[in-house]
């Protein structure tokens, strides 16, 4: 699973998710991408499940980039524990995403194959997503 090698503080406060993503909202590496449309948390397991689903579908056809990393620890107290006695132990890691953030990018495959691979990945995620294409790829596909 994805997680930071070392962190300054083991536990973090929850924080608030407001506004849109102002970084990471454009395609940077590939020709196709999966953009999230609402804010929320994506766990390390969900990221890995999405990555495996895409990789299995395209086999060795193209290249995939992950544009998010789970860097926020989520704590959990043991079951049947009374309230109080401090914050729970770190349980898993999540990536905080806001609307407009590109989660995955892909290149080296046809648009139909990329869209299907992204659909399979989106089924593993808890948030609404949208398939996006680079502008110059759209014009090339339309010209054919």
UniProtKB/Swiss-Prot annotation:
Gene3D superfamilies documented for this protein: Ribosomal protein L10e/L16 (3.90.1170.10)
MF terms in GO: rRNA binding; structural constituent of ribosome; tRNA binding
Recorded superkingdom: Bacteria
GO biological process: translation
CDD domains, per the entry: Ribosomal_L16_L10e
Pfam families according to UniProt: Ribosomal_L16 (PF00252)
One term under GO cellular component: cytosolic large ribosomal subunit
Keywords: Ribonucleoprotein, Ribosomal protein, RNA-binding, rRNA-binding, tRNA-binding
InterPro entries linked: Ribosomal_uL16 (IPR047873), Ribosomal_uL16_bact-type (IPR000114), Ribosomal_uL16_CS (IPR020798), Ribosomal_uL16_dom (IPR016180), Ribosomal_uL16_sf (IPR036920)
Function of the molecule: Binds 23S rRNA and is also seen to make contacts with the A and possibly P site tRNAs.
Family named by the database record: Belongs to the universal ribosomal protein uL16 family.
Subunit details: Part of the 50S ribosomal subunit.
Protein name per UniProt: Large ribosomal subunit protein uL16
Lineage, highest ranks first: Bacteria, Pseudomonadati, Acidobacteriota, Terriglobia, Terriglobales
Gene symbol of the encoding locus: rplP
């Amino acid at each position: 699973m994805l997680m930071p090698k070392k962190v300054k503080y083991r536990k973090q406060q929850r924080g608030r998710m407001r506004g849109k993503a102002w970084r990471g909202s454009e395609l940077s590496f590939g020709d196709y991408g999966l953009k999230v449309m609402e804010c929320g948390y994506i766990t390390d397991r969900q990221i890995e499940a999405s990555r495996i689903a895409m990789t299995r579908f395209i086999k060795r056809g193209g290249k995939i980039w992950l544009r998010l990393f789970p860097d926020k620890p989520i704590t959990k107290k043991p079951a049947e524990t009374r309230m109080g006695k401090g914050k729970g132990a770190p349980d898993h890691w999540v990536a905080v995403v806001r609307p407009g953030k590109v989660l995955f990018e892909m290149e080296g495959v046809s648009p139909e194959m990329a869209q299907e691979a992204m659909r399979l990945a989106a089924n593993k995620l808890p948030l609404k997503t949208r398939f996006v294409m680079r502008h110059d790829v759209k014009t090339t596909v339309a010209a054919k």
